[in-house]
Amino acid sequence: YKQTKTCGILEEDTAYGIKKILEPIGVIAAIIPTTNPTSTAIFKSLISLKTRNGIIFSPHPGAKKCTIAAAKTVLDAAVAAGAPEGIIAWIDEPSIELSIEIMKSADMVLATGGPGMVKSAYSSGKPAVGVGNGNTPALIDESADIIMAVNSIIHSKTFDNGTICASEQSVVIVDKIYEQCKKEFVKRGSYILNDEEKEKVRKIILNANG
């Protein structure tokens, strides 16, 4: 997306004298969870910088050190490339009260976390995009580029030991290409459990409490 235009004149209709202009929103308040504290911080930094917005992070208290380290890394690179000092900021000692305060003070909110935090973002009085629990399945059908699909799923699922909720938790494959996809997964280092192994895993991950 390097060449994708995100600011300035996007379209111009000279016949009607109409221009579509993209402009920054301002300062983004970003709520970061403990389950994916670095990748989400980096992602939100990049999309904010790409759209010429500043961003301030409220990390999860249990993962504040790595979230802040990730934010500092992106900030240093951005400043070295010519971005203003302080374009990326963070709360050193995060709390629920401070998270609520920055959401109310910012121009927009990007909230990733549990239902309570996402609800707070939507109740902040500012435009908000909330992201809750993942547990996402992936569907591969006949139209897919099988090699790319399988490779992308493996990369996603193995990133950060698969702890990110947005990582694919299951794959649904149409019958016509099932065996082809299965071979590609195995070829790329995946392991397919047999029935006995599946039952052993099921007993560990599923119990009376879910």
Which residues are covered by each model-predicted region?
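Rossmann-like NAD(P) dinucleotide-binding subdomain of oxidoreductase/dehydrogenase enzymes
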Residues: 6-148
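ALDH superfamily catalytic-core signature
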Residues: 43, 47-51, 69, 118-210
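Nucleotide 5′-phosphate-binding alpha/beta core
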Residues: 1
